[in-house]
Structure formats: C-alpha cells, structure tokens
C-alpha cells in the first residue's frame, strides 16, 4: 500500500501513458543495409505508418482532445516530413528514438 498516494486531478485513481513508435521502413534498412531499398513488399507495408496511420491517429486523438508522444528515429523525420508536420500541427510531442532505430 502506498503511504503517500499521488493526488490525481478530478478524483482520478490513476494515469495512463500512450506512445507511438514510428519506425517506418528504417527497420528494413537496419536488417538489410546492402539491399533494403529493393525489398518492395516490406517497405510498402512499413510505409503505411507514416503515410496512412499517422493522419488517422492524429485525427482520432483530435476528436478525443488527447495529446500524445510519438517516438521517431531521425531517419524517419528526414524521410517523412509530411507525417512530422501532421503530428506537430496536432499539438503532439515528438521524442528522440535514435537515428536509424
């Protein structure tokens, strides 16, 4: 039992933290440094996050009036600036997640 419980606002009993890692296709380039660019199927699947999922997540969180933290490698920031702008326009935080994961 906690002797000095944390006083959460509005009578809440706890808090939750939701974060997203946006690694995109940086994972392919780590696993296959010499020919990662040629693995079209895997790259296509991993590009779904920054191209489709990020706008949907940001819009859902806008509707719920929730802000969150996205952990993103610098490589992804360089390659997906539109996703980064979408996140920032939504008022969300971007946290460092290495350069290439």
PLM regions and their residue ranges:
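Catalytic alpha-helical scaffold of carbohydrate-active enzymes acting on polysaccharides/glycoconjugates
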Residues: 1-101
